Amino acid sequence: LRIVQAFIAAGVPKQAFASLPSSHAGAEEILRRCGRGMVFGDTGSTAKWLTDSRIEVHGPGYSKVVLGPDASANFEKHIDTIVASIAENSGRSCVNASGVWVTSHAKEISRAIAERLAQIVPRLEDDPLAQLAPFANTRAAEYFSGAVDGGLAEGGAEDVTATVRPGKRLVVFEGSTYLLPTVVRCDSPAHALANREFLFPFASVVEVKPEELPEILGPSLAVALITDDEELKTRFLTRSSAHRLNLGAIPTPHIGWDQPHEGNLFEHLYSRRAIQFQKAS
C-alpha cells in the first residue's frame, strides 16, 4: 500500500490500482496472470518463482549479527544492538536478525540475549511499551512454534529462553495469540535451526571459528558485523554475499533509504533508455 500511495502522490491516477486481499492460492493466480510481479515470503512460497523473469523474489532473509573475536570477548557492550536486530518490528521483517554468529562465549551470549528478550511480553495494542504483534492465524503460530520444537527434538540445540522465563512459548493474551521471543543455542552451524527464520522474534546463536567467516554464514540479506578487526572487515567486504552490510553496532533493521539493498523498483517495472530530442527545423 505504501508503494501505491507513492505512485498516487507522484501523479498516477488512483484508478490504475487495486487492492486484492487473497489466500496464497489467489496470490499465485495473480502472479501467473500479471506482466510483472513481486513476491515476498519463505522458501516454500518463493522457490517456484525463482526462474520466472517476470517475478522479482524477496525472501527469506536469514539476516545475522556477527561478533568478531574482539566483540565476542566484550559481548556485554553489544547486547542492545543484538536485541534490537532481533526484536524490532516484532521480528517479522526479512532484515531482522534470525542468527547471532560469534567466535567465542556462545553460552554466555545466548543467555544474556535470552534474559533481555524474556522481558518482552504481550501488551495492549495502545500500550507504548508494546513490542509483540499478535497472530491473526492461530494455526500459523502453532506451526512456527512446532517447527522450533521439532528442531530442538533433534538434539544439538537448547532453547535458552526456556531457562530464564516461566511458561510456554505460545500464549494467549486478551483473546489474541502470541509467540514469545525465543533464543536457541546451536552446537553446530549445520543444525536445522542454525539458519531458520520465523514470523516472531527468534534467533539462533552459533559459535564458529574466525577463519570460517564469512563463507560459513550462507545466504544473508542483512549482516551487522561488529569488530575492529580490519582484516575481518575486508573479508566481509570482498567475500560476503550479504545484500546489506552494516559495519559496526548498527542493528540489521536500520537501513538507509538512499541505499536500497534489493535494487530499485524502477529497474523492475520499467526499461531504462536514454532519449535526446531536438526539433528537426
Question: What spans do the regions from the language model cover?
Answer:
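Generic beta-sheet signal
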Residues: 20, 40, 58-60, 103, ...
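Short acidic-hydrophobic, aromatic-tinged amphipathic segments that line or gate anion-handling sites
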Residues: 18-23, 103, 203-209
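Glycine-rich phosphate/diphosphate-binding loop of Rossmann-like nucleotide-binding domains
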Residues: 1
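Conserved C-terminal structural/oligomerization subdomain of aldehyde/semialdehyde dehydrogenase
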Residues: 4, 11-14, 33, 79, ...
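Short acidic loop-to-helix transition motifs that present clustered carboxylates
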Residues: 21-26, 44, 230-232
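A short acidic, amphipathic alpha-helical/loop segment
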Residues: 29-30, 48-52, 235-236
